[in-house]
Amino acid sequence: MTSHIDDNLWIIALTSKCTQENLAWVLLIMGSLWLTMTFYYWSHPGGPAWGKYYTYSPPLSIIPGPKGFPLIGSMGLMTSLAHHRIAAAAATCRAKRLMAFSLGDTRVIVTCHPDVAKEILNSSVFADRPVKESAYSLMFNRAIGFASYGVYWRSLRRIASNHLFCPRQIKASELQRSQIAAQMVHILNNKRHRSLRVRQVLKKASLSNMMCSVFGQEYKLHDPNSGMEDLGILVDQGYDLLGLFNWADHLPFLAHFDAQNIRFRCSNLVPMVNRFVGTIIAEHRASKTETNRDFVDVLLSLPEPDQLSDSDMIAVLWEMIFRGTDTVAVLIEWILARMALHPHVQSKVQEELDAVVGKARAVAEDDVAVMTYLPAVVKEVLRLHPPGPLLSWARLSINDTTIDGYHVPAGTTAMVNTWAICRDPHVWKDPLEFMPERFVTAGGDAEFSILGSDPRLAPFGSGRRACPGKTLGWATVNFWVASLLHEFEWVPSDEKGVDLTEVLKLSSEMANPLTVKVRPRRG
């Protein structure tokens, strides 16, 4: 690899020789050189960040990709529906398998192909996360999602798999999920035959479920004085901050300005989170029990080598609340939208429910385990409307590596456009059609796993950085959807049809909240 002198040394040497008379000429020459280098870097495939790397480390082969603009590269790809824009750019560059682009000074690769996705997601080289200012400001660098690859992160993963999301803990929380489902049914029953927006009910249910699992605190969905409104605001603020594309993450000269007000908003949110979660930890420590009722109890009972500091516990527990709340609500809203839009599919799910459960009692989680068409519907909605179309949080290479035959240097951000993979006609037959039958027909994908083993549909990620709560999330979504479809028929509102327009925040959600009517089915 060719070595090069620090870019700043020649500037210092040149300016030291300046006099007042020739300073203007020196500045003009320096500006011209800077512009020349800027445009030279930009002229390379992939844009300025890749051009800077290629200048000093000429590769054997260059990854295709758009140049974007000088200095900022392809920052425009990350505006609005980034997964759409990136897929279109990959098609234009004929680089669906692997495309390079620049976000300011950040080198990025992205794939829209399942084979290359598997190569990236299962590679130990891409076990780290890229730096994100909002994640660090919100303490998530000490939680499972954003913690740097190393001993601490491996310890968190072990705690999550052995204690927090183990089958025993998931089974122990079955009753609370059933009680929350019953509360949702009660609220919707009181609004039957009237147009209603279901999003707030789903968000409250998801938040209540996570609060009970994580902190052992139970909330009544219909109680306006339960404190859930204030807690929901904290979660929404964190969700919005992490979902914002922060230009300062990719343009170092903006780091001191906080032009998007992200650092200021994080600094206001963190003390409130610390007080809220810290108080709960203190209460649990003061009244410690023999049984581990919730995640706080589990963390407090860990043996000495695995014990976490209070600040680390706050980060881990807050991330659990944050990650487990909106994703479940967003996905169920998409499922109910599809049920209202496709009544024949809804009827088939309800026929299966009636055959397995009957109408004399409510659905139990054990009932869902023997169903085939309902899980197929959930998989098909995940295929068409993946909550994390770019798998939400990107990967970072910790060493030089080779992906799809191309050299990828250490420090490169990698993305997987799962939205593009899920709509690729070379991967799926009639990819734009809503057909749950593709997962249940003979010779189809009845046993198709969405938990990470098949890159064609891996909404929870795959490999070392897969979502640790995927089994709990899958169980919750299937059970609640079964309960809601068993109790009600879902039809579009008279005022509005079903609008499938999406908006990309941290997750891809419905741009316009679903407005429907519900009709009781069980008397």
From Swiss-Prot:
EC number(s) per entry: 1.14.-.-
Source organism, top-level taxon: Eukaryota
Principal EC category: oxidoreductase
Binding-site residues for heme, renumbered to this chain: 467
Cofactor(s) required, per the database record: heme
InterPro entries named among the record's database cross-references: Cyt_P450 (IPR001128), Cyt_P450_CS (IPR017972), Cyt_P450_E_grp-I (IPR002401), Cyt_P450_sf (IPR036396), Cytochrome_P450_78A (IPR051996)
Pfam family name, one: p450
Key words of the record: Heme, Iron, Metal-binding, Monooxygenase, Oxidoreductase
GO molecular function, one term: oxidoreductase activity, acting on paired donors, with incorporation or reduction of molecular oxygen
Family, similarity comment: Belongs to the cytochrome P450 family.
Name of this protein: Cytochrome P450 78A3
Native source species: Glycine max (Soybean)
Gene from which this protein is expressed: CYP78A3
